[in-house]
Design a protein with these regions (language model features):
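Pyridoxal 5′-phosphate
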Residues: 1-273
Length: 273
């Protein structure tokens, strides 16, 4: 019997996910942009998944943008917010323990003339809230932090971070990389003051190659991909119906009886330690 302990890297898909992925690949295979029956059937899977995911966070369905995964979501949050808001300023704040899909785009933005402040973390992986407050300026347009670190497991106090940001500069956007948090924590972007939030499907027993970016209604952000105008013009390209459908199935499973699942994980952790 194989015991797999690398679920922070990726997860095995659930049977319910596998079933809906196969069904959308072999039976309901239409292009969701098509106006005939097969297309409308495919589009319904996307609508259903978007509703499921929006409901898990108590946000509007139109605030969920499907992507090819966490890296694209992070890239769009950073580049899209920077390009759309650069008239207000060109200063961005992040931390020293971000994923390469955040850290590397910040390097590119620096090459393009943006100023990036990288905050250090303590030995537990947490940023100093005092240093964050001191770093925020009138021209700070974006702060980007992880929710849960993928290597050391540090959990950042995102709601406290947001309060500091909005108190110092209400127009500064707050992006959260929640790729290791979604499915494990109850996430409420509205309550927690999060403007942009990245998630990946394969971290929650869904398919690889699909994710989403939560974009709070009213946030100014530009697309990364231009073309046929899918997803209200924010992310062109024919949608990955099997991936999105599988993502929705995984999200539904993760947040059904969520408290009981979390308690079981805590018991297993305590047993192993």
């Amino acid at each position: 019997m194989e015991a797999y302990f690398d679920n922070s890297a990726t997860t095995k898909v659930l049977d319910s996910v596998k079933d809906i992925v196969v069904k959308t690949m072999t039976e309901d295979y239409g292009n969701p942009a098509a106006k005939h029956r097969k297309g409308m059937e495919a589009e319904q899977y996307i609508r259903d998944a978007r509703k499921i995911i929006a409901d898990t966070m108590k946000v509007q369905e139109k605030e969920i943008l499907f992507t090819s995964g966490g890296s694209e979501s992070n890239n769009m949050a950073l580049f899209g917010a920077a390009w759309a808001n650069q008239r207000a300023g060109k200063h961005i704040i992040s931390t020293s323990i971000e994923h390469p899909s955040v850290y590397n785009p910040l390097g590119v933005l620096e090459e393009l003339g943006f100023e990036v402040t990288i905050l250090p973390v303590d030995h537990d992986g947490h940023i100093s809230l005092k240093e964050l407050e001191e770093a925020i300026r009138p021209d700070t347009i974006l702060v980007s932090t992880m929710y849960v670190n993928n290597e050391v497991g540090a959990v950042e106090p995102v709601e406290e971070i947001s309060k500091i940001i909005k108190a110092k500069n209400p127009s500064t956007l707050y992006h959260v990389d929640a790729i290791q948090a979604y499915g494990k924590y109850v996430i409420r972007p509205k309550k927690q003051g999060i403007d942009l939030l990245s998630v990946s499907s394969h971290k929650i027993h869904g398919p690889k190659g699909v994710g989403f970016l939560y974009i709070r209604n009213g946030v100014k952000i530009k697309p990364l991909i231009y073309g046929g105008g899918q997803q209200a013009g924010m992310r062109s390209g024919t949608e990955n119906v099997p991936g999105v459908a599988g993502f929705g199935a995984a999200a539904k499973e993760m947040y059904t009886n969520h408290a009981e699942k979390v308690q079981k994980l805590i018991e297993l952790k305590d047993y192993m330690t």
